[in-house]
């Protein structure tokens, strides 16, 4: 049986494969209007997956965070974000910047494209820090844990 999913015609195969994955394996809803935004994937547990292949502006990130709160997760294509995601493991975190930590992770259904998933760390929201941690269930040898103002690699 072939599963068809309704996606924007401008979306890449990478986007479509991710959406199909969540639809088939997690029973997700796609392209759901929540407030003023349309989220890519809405999981049955209420978590939202935003699938992103190009950098967003700070305003675009903050607008989604304001709308989705702590339900927001990001799936990034690390092939395209190689020079745009900042690994700040040994530096202080700034309120002015968003920090993303890359992890090499390969999904069989995605093919050669490495992808990474991030979720907002609630404790850092309270302290007005803009930091994303890796979701640990997507683990392939390197995990970044967060402790105060530094990140240790396991």
Tell where the protein language model's regions lie, with residue ranges.
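Acidic-basic catalytic patches of nuclease active cores, encompassing PD-(D/E)XK
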Residues: 1-33, 43
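Mg2+/Mn2+-dependent nuclease catalytic core
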Residues: 55-82, 86-89
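Short linear motifs at secondary-structure transitions and domain/linker junctions
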Residues: 16-20, 25, 46-52, 97-103
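Beta-rich catalytic cores
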Residues: 37
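Structured beta->alpha junctions
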Residues: 33-34, 53
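Non-catalytic C-terminal interaction segments of nucleic acid-processing enzymes
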Residues: 78-154
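Hydrophobic beta-strand segments of well-ordered beta-sheets in folded domains
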Residues: 46-48, 70-75, 123
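Conserved catalytic cores of phosphodiester-cleaving nucleases, focusing on short active-site segments
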Residues: 41-57, 68
């Amino acid at each position: 049986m072939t599963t068809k999913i309704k996606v924007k015609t401008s979306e890449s195969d990478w986007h479509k494969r991710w959406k199909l994955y969540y639809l088939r394996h997690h029973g997700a809803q796609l392209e759901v209007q929540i407030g003023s935004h349309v989220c890519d994937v809405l999981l049955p547990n209420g978590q939202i997956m935003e699938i992103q292949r190009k950098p967003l502006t700070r305003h675009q990130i903050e607008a989604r965070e304001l709308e989705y709160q702590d339900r927001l997760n990001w799936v990034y294509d690390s092939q395209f974000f190689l020079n745009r995601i900042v690994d700040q493991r040994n530096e202080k975190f700034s309120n002015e910047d968003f920090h993303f930590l890359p992890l090499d992770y390969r999904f069989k259904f995605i093919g050669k494209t490495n992808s990474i998933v991030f979720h907002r760390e609630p404790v850092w929201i309270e302290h007005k820090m803009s930091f994303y941690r890796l979701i640990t269930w997507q683990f392939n040898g390197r995990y970044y844990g967060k402790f105060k103002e530094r990140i240790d690699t396991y």
